[in-house]
Amino acid sequence: MKNLIKNIQNFAGRYGPWKKGDKIIAAVSGGPDSVCLLDVLVKLAPKYNFKLRVAHINYGLRGKDSNRDEKFVRELARRYGLEISVLSIAKNKIYENAKVFQLPPNPPFPKGENLENWLRKIRYDFFEKIRKKEKYDLIAVAHNQDDQAETVLMRILRGAGLQGLSSMKPKNNKIIRPLLNTGRKEILEYLKANKLKYRTDITNKDIKIFRNKIRHRLIPYLEKNYNPNIKKTLADMVLVIADDYDYLLANEERAIKRAGADINKKGGVILSAKKFQKLHPAVQRQCLRKIISQIKTDLTDIEAGHIEEIVKITASAKSKIQKAEFKGLKIKRKGDKVRIWIN
């Protein structure tokens, strides 16, 4: 499927996620998307002079299936002649090819978090540790156009702001997403044409899981009744939103200072209600999300309504003490001072 590889090259040319000679870690779960990603990177390596390495995480959440995934990815790396790093969360160990390193116990499960968010943090922390240790430039993950559409719908339904709607970019710091403009159907066709095997996670069919319900119920309904190209439409929209968000982001540090914010990760954040109210409403919301991100690991469960509740507290003319509490956060206003901290 030359068209898929050409599409990825064109996408990379537009958004510049990599440059010639880059050393790239490919995050491979063993599923169809990551197997496709690895094969494409291997085929592009001679042209771009890439040096590649595989990283895999065995969460141990699916018992023998998790171990079979790990075995499959190890064999895949061997066939491509690539080195591999494996994090086994169940055994609390990192495997660097033949070497084994005992890890300290994982940090305690933080308040206000859920399992999915915490595992995501462990995953990206591991990739970054390997990147720094092995002196690599980038980490390639296999998010595709379907993932982008599913994610934006999830976040719209949860009331996300610009940050939540624009977080999956072609490149976020050291994270690149070469497949972000490629649909799942194209990926499966590529795997079939190239006779590439992959692992299947049966939990992806469980519609009790929010993302799966959107994937198997909502998106097909929207495609049939409203827009047959809804996935591409949503994915393209996110790229536009990302540009708008980047503009706000460029000015957020200055805005936080103008709000008189004093950030202390342990004690939380204190800001001036009067100074905060002088900011443009769009900047206010962005400031609050940035401030909260300094004291809370993940903002996935922070909805637009939560942000608006804090804005209302800062704008209130009431003289009595005002309080709010949600998603592990506490907010308290006394006079001009508004304090935000982890419950």
PLM feature spans:
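A structural signal for well-ordered alpha-helical scaffolds and beta->alpha junctions
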Residues: 1, 5, 70, 180, ...
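Catalytic subdomain that performs nucleotidyl-dependent activation
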Residues: 133, 138-142, 147-237, 241, ...
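Non-catalytic, surface-exposed connector residues within folded enzymatic/regulatory domains
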Residues: 67, 208, 228-231, 300-304
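AMP-forming adenylation/ATP pyrophosphatase catalytic core
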Residues: 4-33, 50-57, 89-91, 100, ...
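Short hydrophobic alpha-helical segments of the AMP-binding
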Residues: 41, 191, 334
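ATP-dependent adenylation/nucleotidyltransferase module used to activate substrates
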Residues: 2-155, 185, 275
